[in-house]
Regions:
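Internal gly/pro-rich beta-alpha loop/helix module
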Residues: 140-226, 235
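A glycine- and small-aliphatic-rich helix-loop capping segment at beta-alpha/alpha-beta transitions
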Residues: 60-68, 87-90, 110-114, 137-150, ...
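N-terminal amphipathic/basic leader segments beginning at the initiator methionine
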Residues: 1-44, 48, 56, 81, ...
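Internal helix-turn-beta structural module
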Residues: 330-419
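Active-site segments that bind and position negatively charged phosphate/pyrophosphate groups
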Residues: 269-346, 354-355
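Glycine-rich oxoanion-binding loops at beta->alpha junctions
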Residues: 75-119, 159-160, 164-165
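Short beta-strand segments
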Residues: 48-50, 73-76, 124-128, 187-193, ...
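Accessory alpha-helical/coil subdomains and C-terminal extensions
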Residues: 165, 183-186, 208-289, 293
Length: 419
């Protein structure tokens, strides 16, 4: 049963409901339980979870794994461990750039899964963020951090970044599964990459690598990466192309996130349209595009919702603070100024957006004007990649806290019937 239409000033209340319902639909607990339901593992059972959703996935899995359980390791982002899990050691590390604690957690996982037998099973829970959090570098950590920072600053997408990182790691590109052999690996994957390419999610620690050394070298040259001789040599080496000890199941994706958001929009009286669940472009361009759609349909006399899912990129031009979702909102704010019935929000399903405490940003037709009243130059803030401070000045930051899931971002334009 649909809720009655609300006045324009309730657009933000609608946005909050949509965000809450969409994220709730892709939480990993039930998905992990479904993946493990009816599974019987012979011999000893070990649990390794890596990524921003690792703690929540591990908690659900631990409740299912009772017989022959021999221990586990969780490696997740700072602030994402929400308590103890019986017989499971929990580590927090750096993201999006790995740090010493990322390495400590990975070392613990490698030690736990060393010298296993054919009758043993490693239940491997993988989610977005695993590329930074699950790491055993073949280079000094400082050098690996520098390579990652160069790629991020150049605007490389997640596939390109992972193609490079898996060749500089002892666990990525199928190498963790090879380490676990001859034990069986049952991998449960929460997908954060468009199209669900298993070899790219968290750089594919338990999946054969489909990328080539030629592709890695091309990426490095195209972005002008400054690399040591050792790094160039590693990029020229191939990764495992076959793994016979792994079974993989995908659970959760951006497609499900968009579908849940669309259902929430419909329940609130909007006519939803999912424009794409494979969004991959410059963040500010996505914001401008939605603003153009808003101006086209603002007077249609309907309650409309246009949705996009995916992961945009930000080419750093300034030294400000922000994230891709905040930049979408700031860009949209400039384009929808004066439209009293329009609102745009963009949020990361994991509850984080860039190196900030915000999950994303929200803007309506009054946001740009409010910024001017606060002495904030929205255009300059966008050029400086300083969306965080611009939005913060007008209450435009979305802060959900860590959600425990990670299936990319969802961006929504809401249009209410103009009054």
């Amino acid at each position: 049963m649909q809720e009655k239409s609300k006045p324009v000033d309730n657009l933000r209340a609608d946005a909050e409901k949509i965000i809450t319902r969409a994220i709730a639909a892709v939480l990993p607990d039930a998905a992990v339980e479904r993946a493990l339901k009816g599974k019987t593992f012979l011999g000893r059972v070990y649990l390794v979870a890596a990524g921003k959703a690792a703690w929540q996935m591990a908690q659900a899995a631990r409740a299912c794994l009772q017989d022959n359980f021999c221990g586990g390791v969780v490696v997740t982002k700072y602030g994402h461990v929400n308590g103890e899990i019986a017989d499971v050691a929990c580590f927090e590390g750096g993201h999006p750039v790995p740090d010493e604690n990322s390495l400590r957690g990975t070392d613990a996982a490698l030690a736990l899964t060393e010298d296993l037998t054919e009758s043993d099973t490693v239940v491997f829970l993988l989610s977005g963020g695993g590329s930074a959090l699950f790491e055993k570098p073949l280079l000094p950590l400082a050098e690996l951090q520098d390579v990652t920072n160069q790629l991020l600053a150049a605007g490389a997408d997640i596939v390109e970044i992972n193609t490079i990182r898996k060749r500089l790691s002892a666990v990525k590109g199928g190498r963790f599964a090879r380490h676990c052999a001859p034990a069986q690996v049952f991998a449960v994957v929460l997908s954060d990459i468009l199209g669900d390419p298993l070899d790219m999610i968290a750089s594919g620690p338990a999946y054969p690598d489909s990328s080539s050394c030629a592709q890695a070298l091309d990426i490095a040259k195209r972005y002008g990466l400054r690399l040591s001789e050792r790094a160039w040599a590693l990029l020229a080496q191939e990764t495992p192309k076959t793994l016979e000890n792994v079974e993989t199941q995908i659970t959760g994706s951006v497609r499900e996130l968009c579908a849940a958001a669309a259902a929430a929009c419909e329940a609130l009286g909007y006519e939803p349209m999912i424009l794409t669940d494979c969004l991959c472009c410059e963040a500010r361009e996505a914001g401008s595009m939605l603003a153009s759609i808003a101006r086209t349909h603002a007077r249609d006399g309907k309650n409309l919702a246009f949705l996009m899912g995916g992961e945009t990129v930000v080419h750093l031009r300034g030294k400000g603070l922000g994230g891709r979702n905040q930049e979408i909102a700031l860009s949209a704010a400039l384009g929808i100024e004066g439209l009293s019935n329009a609102l745009v929000f963009s949020v990361g399903s994991d509850g984080t957006d860039g190196p900030t405490d915000a999950a994303g940003g929200i803007a309506d037709g009054e946001t740009a004007q409010l910024m001017r009243q606060k002495g904030v130059d929205a255009v300059q803030s966008l050029n400086d990649n300083d969306a965080y401070h611009a939005l913060d000045a007008v209450g435009g930051l979305l802060k959900t806290g860590a959600t425990g899931t990670n299936v990319n971002d969802v961006t929504v334009l809401l249009l209410r019937t103009a009054e």
